[in-house]
Amino acid sequence: MEKFMAEFGQGYVQTPFLSESNSVRYKISIAGSCPLSTAGPSYVKFQDNPVGSQTFSAGLHLRVFDPSTGALVDSKSYAFSTSNDTTSAAFVSFMNSLTNNRIVAILTSGKVNFPPEVVSWLRTAGTSAFPSDSILSRFDVSYAAFYTSSKRAIALEHVKLSNRKSTDDYQTILDVVFDSLEDVGATGFPRGTYESVEQFMSAVGGTNDEIARLPTSAAISKLSDYNLIPGDVLYLKAQLYADADLLALGTTNISIRFYNASNGYISSTQAEFTGQAGSWELKEDYVVVPENAVGFTIYAQRTAQAGQGGMRNLSFSEVSRNGGISKPAEFGVNGIRVNYICESASPPDIMVLPTQASSKTGKVFGQEFREV
């Protein structure tokens, strides 16, 4: 059967999907609904074709996929009451018993009640969009999400609220494209682990080289306070600054350091400012939480007692895998692998698809690409 893959126009390439996770093999599409929605009903599709029963009664529905083949392996439907009962307990038990290699599509259809233990499970799974109890009591919810059992976490979600009076498009459409389970959540999970938009500057000259210690001022912060455990992968990002006087003798340094239960140092990952004096330079890296780690700190400092250094816009979030690129750029039926997008381009080419050996595999230019 014919399927649109890409359109080449004057100065642009149009594809169905620009895959930030560098994946194009499988695509699951879902949509949730609620009463008074003017859009279509709930659905579940694989490779843009309906998969499994498309008849959804009022309630919360689960579709379980094997990510290695894309096969639908299980289906569940739950019509909850407003309070905890055997149905809500069955939902929690089923979700907690899943093997660690499943993708679960979660979607609503029609009027859905959400008893406390179901809401509690969603909170534990890392939802950031699901409404509070006070909103649930006044609005109907259209909800769609993808849950990855390997991380026991919601990887993507979409929610809309109906005031129970007005008709509107309440359909919550959500797509995920992946090659393997590790691709789901590769750009981060809804629960942002930590973010600071503050700007921190060191003293000018003097002997105090500290710029900032985060996420708290304590020498060691608990990993558990940020839902992190050994083996988790973090995407760490910050902007660093150094003036000319500092660069004449040193630079600005940032490190994330890990500690064991006895507060003993285990390991660290560091980055240094290498840009032009007086400018801000973005630094980003993937960091694996080491074995036996229970605490950590992020520390920014000058490496010389001269001039001024700075740090701003620090954030770190859990992702499903590190950022190593193991697959060459390519077109697939679900779009194009793209690892990162530049805002502008200087080459005359419509696009560049480097080889797997290239350090810039998957690089495309944002001004030349658009999604359908």
Swiss-Prot record:
UniProt xrefs under InterPro entries: ILEI/PANDER_dom
Entry GO terms, CC: virus tail, fiber
Gene name in the database record: 35
Pfam hit, one: ILEI
Protein name: Long-tail fiber protein gp35
Single Gene Ontology MF annotation: carbohydrate binding
UniProt source species: Enterobacteria phage T4
UniProt GO BP: adhesion receptor-mediated virion attachment to host cell; symbiont entry into host cell
Chain ranges of the GG-type lectin domain: 22-193
Keywords: Host-virus interaction, Late protein, Lectin, Viral attachment to host adhesion receptor, Viral attachment to host cell, Viral tail fiber protein, Viral tail protein, Virion, Virus entry into host cell
PROSITE patterns in UniProt: GG_LECTIN
SUBUNIT field: The long-tail fibers are trimeric, with a stoichiometry of gp34/gp37/gp36/gp35 of 3:3:3:1.
Highest taxon above the source species: Viruses
Principal subcellular localisation of the protein: virion
Localization per record: Virion
Function per UniProt: Structural component of the distal-half of the long-tail fiber. The long-tail fiber of T4 is about 1600 Angstroms long with a kink in the middle that divides the fiber into proximal and distal halves. The latter hinge is probably composed of gp35 protein.
Spans through the membrane: none
